[in-house]
Amino acid sequence: MPTKLENFTKQLHAVWLPSFCLDEKRKFDPAGFKNASIILSEFDASNFLRAIDSGLVLDTGGGRYQCLKSSAQEQIFWEGLKSVVPRPLTLWLEPVITMGTIARLSLDFGWPADVLGMQSKDWAFDFVVYQSPTSTKEHISGEVKTTAVQCDKLIADLQTYGRTGAIEPLSENPRHKNSFKKWQSLLKSRANLLWVVGPDDYTHLFEIQYGPEKTASFLKTTLDRLQSKCADQINTS
């Protein structure tokens, strides 16, 4: 019986890559795809397939994917230099994990499709769970990183910003500026939970307690708190 990764790879070559390459706005040669870029765990391959097969993530054509609660469209291929022929294409791990996480939120934790979105309104976070289909209030803000180290660094930055009530990035380092953008987004959205997701089920979930002077505490909690039935408990506490 084929593994989930084998099924993923088969569909990539048979469906997703041709759709992406043959789009009128691209016209790429599929031969440019680098098979070595399929560095994906069974866990992540399985969840991506669940997202597509369940219809939680909609294939809008031309290799573009979208959720019901957001207008943002994602793609799963990274485009290399135009000057190289055929143009190099690689699998883009971050959106693959993001879409798989959308599947987990609905199929494992009970959230309806119409509260799930990819990309927050300010583009600070990769995925969002809204409080209701008609609400713009974020209950869960989520970020995907392609390595465990990147996850840990983001968490450390946000904990520092929250503890100090930071009003500027820790430095001009792009990483610090990016994490500061997320900190500012959380202060504005007042999301209840932060879910940081890495490859192969590397994950950290935090309840956010907002304090005075633009401070916040990130309290690590279990994935049980992701259950949709827990939302009312958090929102009314």
Segments from the language model and where they lie:
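A short, conserved, highly charged catalytic patch centered on acidic carboxylates
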Residues: 1-193, 197-237
